[in-house]
Amino acid sequence: LRAFRLSQAGMVIADALERGEELANGHEQLTTRLLQAGAVHPHLSEALKPEDITIVIPAFVRDSTDMSTLQKLTALFQNHPVIITDDASPLRIDVDGAVVIRHSTNRGPAAARNTALEKVSTTYVAFVDLDASITSDQLCCLGSLFKGADIGVVAPRVASQESASQLSHYEVVRSPLDMGVLPALIRPGSRVPYVPAAILLARTAIVRHVGGFNETMRYGEDVDLLWRLSDAGIMCRYEPQVTGVHTPRASLRKFFLQRFHYGLSAAVLAKNHRSYVAPFATNILMIGSLISVVACAPLFVGLFLLAQFVSSSVMLFRIGDDLAHACTTAIMNIVYSARTFADAVTRAWFWLFIILAIFFPSLRWIIAGSVVLPAVSQWSRHRAMNPLTFVVLRSIDNFSYCTGVWCGVLQQKSFAALVPKITVWWRRAG
């Protein structure tokens, strides 16, 4: 949570922003600050021209179905320069209207994108995966966000393509590529800490400046790129008003492996980026309350939560918030911490809690609650499928990811991906 203290003139500007009204003279300093903090977001405006965006498609074509998909995808970008990197596909790629570069050995998506990136001569480059789709008009519209020189990447929402299968219904609700309906500044530790490279639009020079994608990573290379850009002070934006689609995994085995590999990449990312990958981030008071829950000490749970509520409310009230809103925000902060703790229990820490539950029976209730309650809450907002099926698929999703995390931890010989990030107090800004 970030809070800002505003002058009277600043409050007038903030109110105008909230209502979508014309801004008063002298607003630039405040609006720039709010944009850089991710507190407000720019509107889509004048679109880029197709000839200014090169489309890069990393491709591994296994069969005629993949070839047909590639041809249809390329046909969407007839007015763009298109470069396809054939990453040693079993079928040789030959597509009209595209430059094809072939790797003699399979080097992975990061290397495939970098190979094509070297040949790009336009100001902007769009990376589009074979199993994703977006129109030329949508990409050009998305490019209107490149107004500020400090914006290096803009990304659309990547929704899951729905079909008749239960897996497809689940992916529509909980796809790992879909970052939601709200715009955001992409940065570590935020509501949108990363976006997938399934569809990504970037300034060519900026991606080259940071060295492109990390070719040593088979998975998580998109997250690594975005975090390196963030560390370099380059802004990356997520804009869900523009939405592409992605074909979800067709079988439970492929579904499991996808999540497993995402978990596997977490350990590599943690080695390179440390606390950015922390499965749980909170302050010392919330940690105290959670330890008290594990220890079955309800009195201390209440005391720690009360201290968290009072301290948060007072801090917000002191910087100018009204008391009722300060109290409501403090409660929301506690609820959010509980949810992220439940996510950590069922994802990164699942195996640890299963082992500990053998010796500490009270943890079984925490595991059960962390599995069932968030799943039911998420299902109730969509009701796209049978609730039991949703809970089971969500559990498989988390179990697959957790197994990948622990395998990655053992491979990297580092527990960084399992370590929570604990702060003494709330970060204060403004």
Which positions does each model-derived feature cover?
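Glycine-rich, basic loop-to-helix element that forms the pyrophosphate-binding segment
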Residues: 103-120, 184-193
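Short, flexible, basic/aromatic active-site loop/helix in glycosyltransferases
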Residues: 156, 171-192
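Conserved donor NDP-sugar-binding/catalytic core segment of glycosyltransferases
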Residues: 137-169, 247
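Acidic donor-binding loop at a coil-to-helix junction in glycosyltransferase catalytic cores
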Residues: 219-225, 258-261
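Short aromatic/hydrophobic "clamp" motif used to bind/position activated sugar donors
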Residues: 125
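A conserved acidic beta->alpha catalytic loop
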Residues: 61, 86-94, 105, 132-135
